Amino acid sequence: MFKKLINKKNTINNYNEELDSSNIPEHIAIIMDGNGRWAKKRKMPRIKGHYEGMQTIKKITRVASDIGVKYLTLYAFSTENWSRPESEVNYIMNLPVNFLKTFLPELIEKNVKVETIGFTDKLPKSTIEAINNAKEKTANNTGLKLIFAINYGGRAELVHSIKNMFDELHQQGLNSDIIDETYINNHLMTKDYPDPELLIRTSGEQRISNFLIWQVSYSEFIFNQKLWPDFDEDELIKCIKIYQSRQRRFGGLSEE
């Protein structure tokens, strides 16, 4: 046990030596793509890919916490994913129950706070209960915020937010002059989080698939070739190193 702890500490130290500690992205968002293809390549059922993808979430959460990332948002289930086969959807809906049952003690120990964005009231009762239990048990934690985007879609979020803004303006007798970027930000599901500096998508696909479409306007995009179950700690560190090699310009010019 002691040797295992020493090895873990050495690994964390190695990661920290590879990275510029002053330029760790505060918020990383990940589109976890490739579970089904991972399983298909191995002639396994798609649900096996989702199971292995759950193990990857554990690995990435640990290392993100260890290197000082403050927010990690994972695209777990989109509003469009309901169109998948019923058996697959049912399995995915049960994943948070199993994941949080096995991983929650470690999340508590590592001071990780579990949060969600999305229309979670539409999820099965058992899924909602597991999520709410994790939120309650980690509510006072002050470390990494692990944010699951579940039953989430960027366009649906914007429609929902616009309706709320319209109702608020109407009820308070205000006009549209009050609306600016800050006002919109304050009505999004992500209002308590900074925009992601880094968006990673695994599997080699190069699109954002309706994920955080307002929030990633100035994010750095990295499209990693690994399928999500094969994406590991070293791959995350590689992505962060690529991020650190870039200069974020926010529409301006780079320094010469």
From Swiss-Prot:
The keyword Magnesium is assigned to this record: yes
GO terms, molecular function: ditrans,polycis-undecaprenyl-diphosphate synthase [(2E,6E)-farnesyl-diphosphate specific] activity; magnesium ion binding; manganese ion binding
Record keywords, A-Z: Magnesium, Metal-binding, Transferase
Cofactor: Mg(2+)
InterPro entries registered for this protein in UniProt: UPP_synth-like (IPR001441), UPP_synth-like_CS (IPR018520), UPP_synth-like_sf (IPR036424)
Pfam families recorded: Prenyltransf (PF01255)
Presence of keyword Transferase: yes
A Gene Ontology term for the protein's cellular component: cytosol
PROSITE patterns for the chain: UPP_SYNTHASE
EC number(s) stated in the UniProt entry for this protein: 2.5.1.-
Binding positions for substrate per the UniProt entry: 34-38, 46, 50, 78-80, 82, 84, 201, 207-209
Active site per database record: D33, N81 (proton acceptor)
Binding-site residues, Mg(2+): D33, E220
Annotated cofactor note: Binds 2 magnesium ions per subunit.
Domain of life: Bacteria
Stored CDD domains: Cis_IPPS (cd00475)
GO BP terms: polyprenol biosynthetic process
Assembly: Homodimer.
Function: Catalyzes the condensation of isopentenyl diphosphate (IPP) with allylic pyrophosphates generating different type of terpenoids.
Family: Belongs to the UPP synthase family.
NCBIfam families found in the cross-reference section: PRK14830.1, uppS
Protein name: Isoprenyl transferase
Protein species of origin: Staphylococcus aureus (strain COL)
